[in-house]
Amino acid sequence: MATDFLKDSAHPFDADSLIRLLPARPRLLALGEPTHGEDTLLDLRNELFRQLVEQEGYRTIALETDCLAGLLVDEHVTSGAGTLDEVMEHGFSHGWGAFTGNRDLVRWMRAHNEERPPAERVRFAGFDGPLEITAAASPRQALTALHSFLAARVDADLLPCTAETLDRLLGADDRWTNPDAMMDPAQSVGRSPEAGELRLLADDLVALLDAQLPHLRATTSPDAWDRPRLYGRTATGLLRYHAAMADTSPARMSRLCALRDLIMAQNLLALAERGPVLVHAHNAHLQREKSTMRMWQGPVEWWSAGALVSARLGQQYAFVASALGTIRHQGVDTPPPDTLEGLLYALPEDRCLLATAALATALGEPRPAPRVSPWFGYAPLDPAHLDTIDATVFVRDVTRTPSH
């Protein structure tokens, strides 16, 4: 009976159906995925985002990748700077420039923008910090770029330090990117005297940027003003993250996960100030419930970027979660019938869109336990979270593609 009810509640996977399911047209529309790097899911994302750009006027596409590296991609899709190969190699973190789905998205954005005036072009943004699971970047790029921007536009006496002072305090970049620091807090330079002084200087530089707002906005373009604000958020966020890497308390990993998602949330809110944004990331970074993970230190929990943004934007934020049936090449086979994914797998469609209320009704109470994943890279949807999800995309089978 539940399956029959869901059959009547399933909608086509397209932009028009999605917008009709939402309570309001969101300023920030986020599509989550339960695993990374599968081109089946990336192709569906590309299809939906193209429709939302063309039919609903969204003008920024933001992905879970390095916000500074993403500037190269944005320059390419808006102006043609660089080659596609170059921006895929240098404009993405986490190795995601190698995914065919991401390459196809960038190629489409460039073609879409080529004959359009600036106001109609689609922008690209990374909204993650310059962070990897194994290490964090040096704050050098963000700090020196912010200092250079201010030094060219305000009285030198207002600057809290010289570029030479920053360079001396930063030291060699490999001190900051040491991969041993992720497992051993004693290897981190995040709480060294130099790092402490840099945190104060970064705060002073951001304060100067804000204090000079009337002058800087009057003498720069909107894009030129967005860039130093990004540098400021990234510099302070990275220095905060490095300080947490040096933490020896049991809360260390929870704090690091929370700080990463705080960087993400701040970047998303800044992008939303510019106009409607489409977002793609892991479900765990976009959900409204607390995110959880088991790591080498034990269980970790934190508020995701989606939870933080939702608390600020209300109905102007929408979260569309993705669920899937199988990833057979990763050992994820047909889901048990008593799980959320098992119920959806009984539907005839290869892909569909469902209102969360319909899913909750079909599952009934008490809701089933989450599906147990046989592969660490896939996180099934938690039925207990349905009340905080605006809509759900279900993909029956994720298949291996040549890029994998």
Stretches found by the model and what they are:
Residues 1-404:
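Structured catalytic-domain cores with a bias toward divalent-metal coordination
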